[in-house]
UniProtKB/Swiss-Prot annotation:
Reactions accelerated catalytically: a quinone + NADH + 5 H(+)(in) = a quinol + NAD(+) + 4 H(+)(out)
Gene name for this UniProt entry: nuoA
Lineage: Bacteria, Pseudomonadati, Myxococcota, Myxococcia, Myxococcales
Transmembrane segments: 9-29, 68-88, 97-117
Functional summary from the UniProt entry: NDH-1 shuttles electrons from NADH, via FMN and iron-sulfur (Fe-S) centers, to quinones in the respiratory chain. The immediate electron acceptor for the enzyme in this species is believed to be ubiquinone. Couples the redox reaction to proton translocation (for every two electrons transferred, four hydrogen ions are translocated across the cytoplasmic membrane), and thus conserves the redox energy in a proton gradient.
GO molecular function: NADH dehydrogenase (ubiquinone) activity; NADH:ubiquinone reductase (non-electrogenic) activity; quinone binding
SUBUNIT field: NDH-1 is composed of 14 different subunits. Subunits NuoA, H, J, K, L, M, N constitute the membrane sector of the complex.
Protein name listed in UniProt: NADH-quinone oxidoreductase subunit A
Keyword Transcription regulation listed: no
Similarity annotation: Belongs to the complex I subunit 3 family.
Amino acid sequence: MLTPLQIYFPIGVVLLVAVVLAFTMLGLANVLGPRRPSLVKQTPFECGSEPVGSARERFGVKFYVVALLFIVFDIEAIFLYPWAVLLLPDGQGYPGLGWPGFVSMGIFVFTLVAGLVYVWKKGVLDWAD
């Protein structure tokens, strides 16, 4: 049986190498890169075309609310994945979560649906305004 250290050590090494490599490349680019500011480099980039209007426009609050709701429900969907993987026995000795895991995740999913219904009833997802 592998110990947790033996299991997570390769992941830690890869993470450490990735962080060191990223900071090394950023540092080298900062030290060795040319610094020639120009007007073209400071203009906002819009899909390869010339900018139309100002880049400092106000957006409606609805866009931010929808973005926050997307992040919240996306993170909650990420929490569902490990539960789905661990719910049933794997045939190699792991007994699965059983009924307690099923009931607890049922409560979690019910809370998600209740939150979605609440948001829907509040009219947050209504774009008619």
